[in-house]
């Protein structure tokens, strides 16, 4: 036993020493470069080594602005059509929510929370929505829900098909991956600028900025869910003569449902995180209440509106998480 275990131990120790030596080499090289740079800058005038940004030759901001102006001039009809459709969907959802009596809608929320997520989530959802009503923020809450619902519908309508295409083609996957990385890492404030330029002020640009920020998880998790479907099940479907369409809708999408539901959950949470930023471009709802409290330095008003947003997020998170778990149990039964 001892003779067999010694060689692997020696090999591990040798690899560890080699790894430490590499780290020491790179750390020493970095330190030497810093030292040489400091000595060089101390003994030579600045004119000898002009800074990179002394006279920047790349005016990227100008070209981006020119591109935006070109899009506005040449595609104004398309942007107007998108604005009209989005406004109609948003207003339809908001009017439907506000048309119902508060107690009726509260009962419906509790009923469906019980059906989809169980008794505990139903009790919590009912208590949270009742608390929101007692704070006098019911109508603003419904406006926020309408904005979130519209953004999530658009995000899923775009994200799921793109995720399916990315799962079926490595070339498409490699193409959209850097785009999704940029969409997720770009500061959310930046999305407000093109939203205002293309769609003006109000709820519609708020929805569009939210879609840009919240759509990537829908694409990524749909792609991931389909790619994680076992290969033997796909091959079995081909063996029994299933077409690609049948294989997608009867095998791959049902098995990818837990991952897709996780994408919906993440999209909803990211949409909620945008409601306050969307208020900066005149979007309504609870975000505007927080923004107004910030402008008036009204701590109580901001706390109440912020607490309401948190409660809405918790209710939606619990329900959508339960849907994902139900989908996981359904796929395991398959």
What residue spans do the PLM features occupy?
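Hydrophobic/aromatic residues within the transmembrane alpha-helices of Major Facilitator Superfamily
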Residues: 186, 198-199, 211-215, 222-226, ...
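Transmembrane alpha-helices
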Residues: 208-212, 216, 230, 244-278, ...
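Generic alpha-helical transmembrane segments of integral inner-membrane proteins
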Residues: 31, 107-112, 126-130, 149, ...
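Glycine-rich helix-loop "coupling/hinge" segments at transmembrane-helix boundaries
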Residues: 197, 226, 271-312, 324-334
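Transmembrane helix boundary and interhelical loop/hinge segments in multi-pass membrane proteins
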Residues: 121-122, 225-233, 244, 286
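Short amphipathic alpha-helical coupling elements at transmembrane boundaries
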Residues: 80, 84, 88-91, 95, ...
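N-terminal, non-cleaved signal-anchor transmembrane helix
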Residues: 1-146, 327-334
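Generic hydrophobic transmembrane alpha-helix motif, especially the helices
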Residues: 132, 147-150, 154-167, 177-214
């Amino acid at each position: 036993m001892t003779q067999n275990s010694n060689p692997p131990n020696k090999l591990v120790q040798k690899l560890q020493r080699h790894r430490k030596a590499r780290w020491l080499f790179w750390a020493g090289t970095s330190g030497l470069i810093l030292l040489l740079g400091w000595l060089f800058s101390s003994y030579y005038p600045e004119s000898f080594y002009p800074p990179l940004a002394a006279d920047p030759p790349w005016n990227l901001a100008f070209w981006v602005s020119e591109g935006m102006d070109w899009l506005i001039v040449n595609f104004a009809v398309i942007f107007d059509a998108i604005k009209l459709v989005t406004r109609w969907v948003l207003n339809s959802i908001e009017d439907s929510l506000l048309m119902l009596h508060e107690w009726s809608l509260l009962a419906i929320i509790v009923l469906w929370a019980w059906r989809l997520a169980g008794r505990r989530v139903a009790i919590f959802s009912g208590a949270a929505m009742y608390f929101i009503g007692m704070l006098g923020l019911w109508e603003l809450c419904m406006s926020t829900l309408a904005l979130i619902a519209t953004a999530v519908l658009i995000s899923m309508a775009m994200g799921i098909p793109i995720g399916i295409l990315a799962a079926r083609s490595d070339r498409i996957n490699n193409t959209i991956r850097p785009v999704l990385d940029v969409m997720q890492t770009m500061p959310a404030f930046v999305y407000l600028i093109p939203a205002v330029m293309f769609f003006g002020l109000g709820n519609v640009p708020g929805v569009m900025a939210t879609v840009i920020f919240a759509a990537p998880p829908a694409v990524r998790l749909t792609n991931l869910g389909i790619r994680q479907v076992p290969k033997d099940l796909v091959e079995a479907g081909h063996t029994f003569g299933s077409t690609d369409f049948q294989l997608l809708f009867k095998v791959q999408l049902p098995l990818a449902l837990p991952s897709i539901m996780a994408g919906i959950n993440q999209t909803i949470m990211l949409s909620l995180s945008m409601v306050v930023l969307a208020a900066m471009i005149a979007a309504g709802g609870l975000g505007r209440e927080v923004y107004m409290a910030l402008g008036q330095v009204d701590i109580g008003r901001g706390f109440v509106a912020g607490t309401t947003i948190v409660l809405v997020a918790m209710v939606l998170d619990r329900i959508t998480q339960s849907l994902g778990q139900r989908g996981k149990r359904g796929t395991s039964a398959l």
